[in-house]
Amino acid sequence: MLMLQRPEITQEELGKNRTQFVIEPLEPGFGLTLGNTMRRALLSRVPGVAVTGIKIDGVNHEFTSIPGVVEDVLDLLLNLKRLVLKVDDQENHTLTVKAKGPGDVLAAQIQCPAGVEVVNTDLKVCTLSDSSTLDMEVSIAHGVGYRLADKNKTSDSNFIPIDSIFSPIVKVSYTVSPTQVGQVTDCLLYTSPSPRDGRIS
């Protein structure tokens, strides 16, 4: 008679934003199946918040330059793509950036509405030269997985959409090793060296 054992899950915090799970025992062959399924689900199906686009007066596409800003719009968008945010509600929000040069504009200078927090405040957004100014609106939204810039378009011709990566999970890895519990079975060690970017806990 086949006797199935109920797997046990143990969790261990390995440091800031790092977690390890051990699931054992599993029937032979189940470790790879379960591990790959969990990995794909964590990387693609965990909801999060991301930048969907920006609005700067006088700028209507990404292949242009902004007077007084060292980076072009494309580089600025790539920098904002790495912005990590915590949002208390499920609403879309607009953040503002008002800065004057010379010097770097950091994510800490982004003005957020109540319930929105920038996690990586040391992120460099752009560099202003001389006494130039930057007045920019940054739109953020909730979502799952990856969204192309075309899906973030609005009716506003001055709005520049950006590809959005909503997943707060940065990396997932797993290993399967044999364990002895009466007979040879699988043990799934699911570990993520850098699983979260800080927007969830």
Language-model features and meaning:
Residues 1-192, 199-201:
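Protein-protein interaction/assembly regions in multi-subunit complexes
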